[in-house]
Amino acid sequence: MNTPAPTRRQFLFGISAVAGGLLVGLPESRAQTGHGEVTAWVVITPDDTVTIRVARSDMGQGIFTALPMLVAEELECDWAKVRAEYADTNENLTRDKPWGDMVTSTSISVRASQEYLRQAGAQAREMLIAEAAARWNVTPVSCRARGGIVSHAASGRALRFGALAAAAARRPIPENVPLKAPSDWRLIGTSAARIEAAPKVFAEPIFATDVDLPGMLHAAVKNCPTIGGSVVAFDHAAVAGLPGVRHVVQVGKDAVAVVADSWRQANAAVEALPVTWDESIGTGVSNATLRTLFREGLADPAAAIGHRIDDVGASLGGAAQIIDVEYEAPFLAHATMEPQVCTAKVTAERIDLWAPTQNGEGTTNTIARVMQRDAAQIFVHKLQLGGGFGRRGLAQDWARQSVQIAAQVPGVPVRMLWSREEDFTHDYYRPMVLARQTAGFDAQGRLLGWKVRISGSSIAASLAPFWLKEGVDNALMDGFVEEDMPYAVASFEVGVARRDSHIPVGFWRGVNLSQNGWFREAFLDEIAAMRKIDPYLLRRELLSENPRALATLDAAAKLAGWGKPPAGRHQGIAIVEGDNAWCAQIAEISVTDGRLKVHRISCAVDPNFVVHPDITVQQIEGGIVQGLAAALYGEVTVEDGRVQQTNFHNYRYLRMEEMPVIDVALVPSLGRYGDRWGGVGETGLPPLAPALTNAIHPATGKRLRSLPISNHDLRV
Amino acid sequence: MRFPSLILAPILAAATTIAVTAEEVTLPQDEVASLAAFDRLVAVIEHPRCMNCHTSTDFPRQGNARLRHNMGVARGPENHGTPALQCATCHQDNNAPSGVPGNANWHLAPLSMAWEGLDRRGICRQLTDPARSTMTPEQLVEHMNNDPLVLWAWNPGNDLNGLPREKPPMSAGEFGELVRVWVANGAQCPD
Amino acid sequence: MPVLKVNGSPHEIDLPDDTPLLWALRDTLGLLGTRYGCGAALCGCCTVHADGKALRSCVATLADVAGAEILTIEGLGTAATPHPVQAAWLEIDVAQCGYCQSGQMMQAAALLREIPKPSDADIDAAMSGNLCRCGTYSRVRAAIHRAAEFI
């Protein structure tokens, strides 16, 4: 056997010592504040180990490597000696937010923190240099830092970071240190060794499901089968005698839980527990009634207009030909591979949570509010997330439940785990949304006007009502509003009529672009067909004033060999900008006897700057697979108020045998079109569905205007 | 024998009621009994509980809708799945509470014993063709009466939605006895 | 008391016969690398080996595995002595969130045990029972081919 030795790096997941002891089997406790801390971001110990604090959450998007790289680039340390640990949520509060924002959503981690992270690295570097210069009695500018060593060339002296750190930490933190030009980066832009890879490969207990505290009990939950319903009564005595059962408790107004010695015992008991529910909130509500509700929204004359160019009514009124069609995108589940889970311990003095949270401060604030405690009493210990995709950010139902359960067993840590069935049936779903799109053409087929009406449930209304502006959720028009409607059309209008139901909706990869990107790009192909123009060339024409979009589009077309698919195959194209990262995709498919095969996805992406090319490609691959699975199979349906999908047999996901070849070309524009950095977590997803349905049209003659594709008969 | 004459009697009674005109000859009673038994037992063979693993494809099917088995499950060289994804990777000795069906030696019938796509006559030919059946008539009686995997069809448990799986349209005993009668009377096939 | 052999060591297990192996491993033996994903053999997160064959430990009961040699991810390899699959996983950087990866690697190791040089079709057949919501499939495939080169 000939195996290369893996580069093994320590991976610290911010597990601090708490009353009750260290977690068994978890890596050593985080460096304590004050021990080698040069700044809040950078900890250097005498052995030259550099620990960089990460404020955002790692859910597989590689920020435990990418964010430390931004610091290390300016710090000039030795990457092989870099470790990463979570910045402590509670300390962020008590130390006046040295780590800033901890939110991990909307592909924000790199793009929103890159500047202050590079600055943090530069500040620590300057402090180390200042300390060395003082010891040598030379000017700091005559010294330089490189590879974890400060040196003074003129005298030939050098000191390791580890020998300087403790004293450097007492020096003032300089402000506004000039940052390197991108052309001078040596680490950023390389696929540096991943910090967080080994613990996953050697299956270390890094997930919230793996938390194992002394004396810990296990909880299983049964939520009201209709979301938003409530518990009327439950028969505690019926299960009290079952093996291992310790407590049977109500959780909030809408759930019950059994606390037992093991999760299996807890789950067996909660499944056997007789509960009477009030499900009247959902009586009679189904996909059909919601469709009717949203359709009525599409015709609402009071729709809020989000963007208007010229007078679309007049343009359509004078049209010789009209396309007037309705698109429908279904509810989707997050279905993180790790179901909802959280461990909590509640005492009079403090509340500890071991949480897979996308937003440590969001968890803190939720628990402080629900438990009526001071936020400083809440200690959120973040772990690696077994997938997030938006499920574990603003939606903190799982954290709340875990504390509400543990509060009924004070002083005892309780690990709450939802069964997969609870997870599927109690999500904050990607909203079901309908769009009506109308385009008018003159007798020669020239586009005169394009009108869009959108209706569906609002994520803001469900999770963050304060985001609504006079009741309007502008996010429902993402991709169509002035900032992100890229196409130069003479007459255009988008409007929205929000319609909410008892089914909660939430952030899902790509958020509203996951529907609207498809609506827009699929309809653009309908326009191209009316104009009898190649869909790629139509996009080129309408993007002619946008060189950045054009470059991305052209790169994808070149990568895919647009217009020259192999015999028997067909192509479809789409381009969407998400979080300031342009992404163009071309799907290459065949349809045989109604059976669709996706052969290849060619993708070009321009996030402006790329920190770690391989992670970036990984994120795009992930977006494509998630988008493909959703387009092919994804659909959550509601019947009489209840969600019908319960597990992976009736909510299909893409499997290995269905994988297309994925080619990704990174085409970063490196600041040519502006300074704003892009995020790559989500932008890979929105173009997939339209590229795919746009390829199905030439293959079958069919325009698919509802998803998933598996609901359609593709036989010609 | 579990249900001796109990079942046999009505079958023979049915056979004797065939009207015979002067020009017609009377079929031998054993042939009539055999055909009548086959005519009834084939409804079990055609049931999804049996047919889903007696496929003519390189994969099993599942459910009453007889969809291709999820997860790309394939027949494999010995009808027990592919080398690394065996039937026994998931299917255990008993039905699992989660809805995953189980029985010792869960596997597909060999392709030579495929019934899928055949009409009743074709199924009968398959059963009685020594080259394809790989079972003697006596072995068929044994298989249909006592093979635990066959009998699973009458103890199919709940599906993944928690609903009882549909059983074949007659009891295991009735089916086993019909097979016995069919074989005992010459394993006759319809034309 | 029934004895369960895991990663070469016997363990006395005081649990009912119908306990799924997964929960004996996780909750009783503290082997937390084998993970719960669906409870119904639909996702493959919980894959272990029983006598060298892939097994979904969420549906296999202690009765089903009586007498079998169980291998979990903890017994597959270590950082110091990685299994070829683990070495390849690191080289290709397969994992994203990582939650399904124990099951992916155990399934891949079972495949390589049966077919040391698997084709893409062999990989499709062996790996299609293992879900990955992050979408690491292309890299899983590449890493299995790479691991085959190490063997």
Predicted regions and their residues:
Chain B
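N-terminal export/targeting leaders of redox proteins
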Residues: 1-42, 62, 73-78, 95-191
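N-terminal, post-signal-peptide region of Sec/Tat-exported proteins
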Residues: 46-80
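The canonical Cys-X-X-Cys-His
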Residues: 48-57, 84-94, 179
